[in-house]
Amino acid sequence: MTKKPGGPGKNRAINMLKRGLPRVFPLVGVKRVVMSLLDGRGPVRFVLALITFFKFTALAPTKALLGRWKAVEKSVAMKHLTSFKRELGTLIDAVNKRGRKQNKRGGNEGSIMWLASLAVVIACAGAMKLSNFQGKLLMTINNTDIADVIVIPTSKGENRCWVRAIDVGYMCEDTITYECPKLTMGNDPEDVDCWCDNQEVYVQYGRCTRTRHSKRSRRSVSVQTHGESSLVNKKEAWLDSTKATRYLMKTENWIIRNPGYAFLAAVLGWMLGSNNGQRVVFTILLLLVAPAYSFNCLGMGNRDFIEGASGATWVDLVLEGDSCLTIMANDKPTLDVRMINIEASQLAEVRSYCYHASVTDISTVARCPTTGEAHNEKRADSSYVCKQGFTDRGWGNGCGLFGKGSIDTCAKFSCTSKAIGRTIQPENIKYEVGIFVHGTTTSENHGNYSAQVGASQAAKFTVTPNAPSITLKLGDYGEVTLDCEPRSGLNTEAFYVMTVGSKSFLVHREWFHDLALPWTSPSSTAWRNRELLMEFEGAHATKQSVVALGSQEGGLHQALAGAIVVEYSSSVKLTSGHLKCRLKMDKLALKGTTYGMCTEKFSFAKNPVDTGHGTVVIELSYSGSDGPCKIPIVSVASLNDMTPVGRLVTVNPFVATSSANSKVLVEMEPPFGDSYIVVGRGDKQINHHWHKAGSTLGKAFSTTLKGAQRLAALGDTAWDFGSIGGVFNSIGRAVHQVFGGAFRTLFGGMSWITQGLMGALLLWMGVNARDRSIALAFLATGGVLVFLATNVHADTGCAIDITRKEMRCGSGIFVHNDVEAWVDRYKYLPETPRSLAKIVHKAHKEGVCGVRSVTRLEHQMWEAVRDELNVLLKENAVDLSVVVNKPVGRYRSAPKRLSMTQEKFEMGWKAWGKSILFAPELANSTFVVDGPETKECPDEHRAWNSMQIEDFGFGITSTRVWLKIREESTDECDGAIIGTAVKGHVAVHSDLSYWIESRYNDTWKLERAVFGEVKSCTWPETHTLWGDDVEESELIIPHTIAGPKSKHNRREGYKTQNQGPWDENGIVLDFDYCPGTKVTITEDCSKRGPSVRTTTDSGKLITDWCCRSCSLPPLRFRTENGCWYGMEIRPVMHDETTLVRSQVDAFKGEMVDPFSAGPSGDVSGHPGSPSQEVDGQIDHSCGFGGPTCADAWGYHLH
């Protein structure tokens, strides 16, 4: 029998019927009660008591407690608070009675009172100081005085004051002064932390503590991000974290706009990989590398080789920071030219910004309502910042009336840390350059500058604007002359050197001037905009606290991300910029050419070493003592065939001394692949096997890349230029093409048909090859060859071939052929038609009625996208149509600009397909492109020059040019399609519209100009040759129609042709006689006037012409409608009514032609003195040395 569980409860271990309270430690119970009250739970009276406690101790109650307080009904709250007030009154009465009882107990009442008063005064004197402020009593206290009542004896009796401020610290510069008002009996203090019972006084105390800094504002200054610097720089930019994102975006755009290249890269990547993982990796790497080579040549080579053509006496150099150029020429010693340092001194201070300020000596003056406006006397001190306002006053803070009282707070501003901006003066930039001869150098002297200077194998010099030319003597090697153009390539007017703490940065001028920080000028000590680093906190009845913002150094450093870091102490070392020099080698000579060959044995002192630049350095030890003698050294492909391959960088190496075991360093460039370095003759010959990785095709590609990198470094200020294929003669003259550069280097002399056939042949050989590697190589090479032969490639620069009259932007060719017709292969496209349609809509709402095209290519772009824009406008319910009219005359300018917007219009597939077949109907409102000026859409309401080239794409028949909206307003032409060059005695300024050619014959003068169209933008100075100190009145092609401000745009005897026939089509400006006419120079000829056509309205030829002091042959304009003469050449004795005059005035409204308005008999009309005038020209001596100055510079392609 089993026993049932259970039983009496009393016998169980735990009696469930009589379970007692749990045993809890008393403190734990108290904690639980307090925590529940803090959470707002419990009796109302306890909650209100706890809130009162927090109020008295100036502690912040919890959110739950405040929530319970707000939920208490008004009547309940008033009931409990009234009882609190009664209890407080009882306590006050008890304290007062206690004081009276103690006084009654004393036997000697007068003595005790006197001693007590004396003790109080002594205590006050030890802890408190009394003075005057604003005509009232001022007590200066510390943190020990606020625990008790402060008693101040006055003539009216004791003045008892209570200070309950929580920011009282020890006395320091950070002080605050404000008024303690007088409160009458029975009034509780309200919005004051200091009050007295007899009369008001001012209180002053320091706010410093031993444990922490002064109170600071949590606010920070918003500093605009500096952004990526436009300068090409050798060093990494500061905190530059944006390049990776931008590069990925650039890769995406490149793939979208160059699908042919992207497809080719994907195919190559897929063929290179042996499994899917490798194929994906290779494809991604190729796609990432391709746009870097195509558009943004990252990284700079440390050493470049420049080969001078045979018989050359000079070579143009472009020296960059930390770069070294090795110059090799036939029958000349090899030179190393190194840019050692670019330094700017005597920087002028422009402005200082305060990024860390301190606030001291705060004082507040307050007034009651109806007692007048508060005035703080410290307002008169310029070092103080003051602020006036109003506060609520009443019985609880010392005023008899309730209302708004005036308050005036002042605080002293002082700057703790400041950032200083300095400007670089171009005349204070100096360049330190070193030249080293590849002569006989021992390993001990290699790199030893002092030893090489002693052996006349090296020299160091400084180039400044005041000393741009220098001649260096190199001992037995002769002498070398450098004529340098001291232009750093750094626009000193656009950048400042900004020093923040211990770091200095090169920052944009506009960004620097727009900083929202207090600033001061060097000539002043007063800070402006000081309130940016100060915060006036909320005003209380008689007190207002002022705090300073924390240091903004971190924010500045963050905002400077992308700026270039520079070193600055008393001078700044620049890492951006370049120096153009012409190195004259006519007086250089090889040393040791008459020495005999060394006959004894050589040995390799060390194994040959790769320099990393494709060359090898060999240290040889010579056992003989028959020196000086020449070293027989050569590089051969095979020991059985001693035909030299490769070349010597150290030209004519020799042993300089007759001592045995002398060591010599020799540098040579072996060929790609396997070769042997052979030293010595006969049985004493030694050799060393050498393998050089790479290929000739790869070198051609890297050579082109070098030219692209140099262009990236120089920007638009200088560009070495040579004709197609010139890469074999001068690496520094590589054509700026990337993929196509190597292609044209190897196959540039062939026609595209031959190139295509060769590619097809390689493809056929690849298909039939048995070896897989060879087949893939043939297929890849043939495919690339066919692709490059049949496509027009992309690029970002323009090149000029003067002899072939050819200009290339990308590979699109702009040919000026024998019949002087322009053939272009360019097509302008907007970034996206959807965004352009939205931009047009936005501009129309802002009052822009249309646009004026800058060039005919832009006009063609509007024609091409007109229907698509109209469909987009119609699909988005916009009653507006784009109307493109035929341009009349030259392309005129307009004052307004289109503005960028991030919004886009949307269009469905159905509407897009319909737009291909049908043009949309014309809307009620129109947006007019070009055409004649009308009352409906005058030029003053049109936009112009709103687009700029963003990128170049590719196509089968044309180079695609992608346009984007300009961010800034400018009148300059787009520099992306401009090329400028000097070669020999010919200088050219050219773009897709102009070919302006000048020649040198005793002096430089304009020879010819061909205009595809005439535009109204201004030629940028960055693409202008010889543009120093040019008078606009001497420019034959006016600068208002894109005439370059260059001395190449001049001709003796002629002034600016502002009234030439610029509205005609197909203009060719040259210097010759119009058919069937003659021109004579006579003083009786009439003065300048608008250009006149040589045929009348009826077609009759005007044969006789004259000029006052022009030069012959005369200036003429050949157009589609006939031949015109320049403004100086006038018809002789002809009916004025039948003449066909030019109706153009290229000058703007405020400009006046001074020559047409000159006195009779003076063709020039200019203010030059007779001693200065030569044939109507003012004689200006050339800044570079007279008539040969322009030829003294190799102005190569910009």
Swiss-Prot record:
UniProt keyword NAD, yes or no: no
InterPro entries in UniProt: Env_glycoprot_M_flavivir, Env_glycoprot_M_sf_flavivir, Flav_gly_cen_dom_subdom1, Flavi_capsidC, Flavi_capsidC_sf, Flavi_E_Ig-like, Flavi_E_Stem/Anchor_dom, Flavi_E_Stem/Anchor_dom_sf
Pfam family, one: Flavi_propep
One example of a Gene Ontology biological process annotation: clathrin-dependent endocytosis of virus by host cell
Highest taxon in the source lineage: Viruses
PTM summary: Genome polyprotein: Specific enzymatic cleavages in vivo yield mature proteins. Cleavages in the lumen of endoplasmic reticulum are performed by host signal peptidase, whereas cleavages in the cytoplasmic side are performed by serine protease NS3. Signal cleavage at the 2K-4B site requires a prior NS3 protease-mediated cleavage at the 4A-2K site.
Protein name: Structural polyprotein
Protein's organism: Japanese encephalitis virus (strain SA-14)
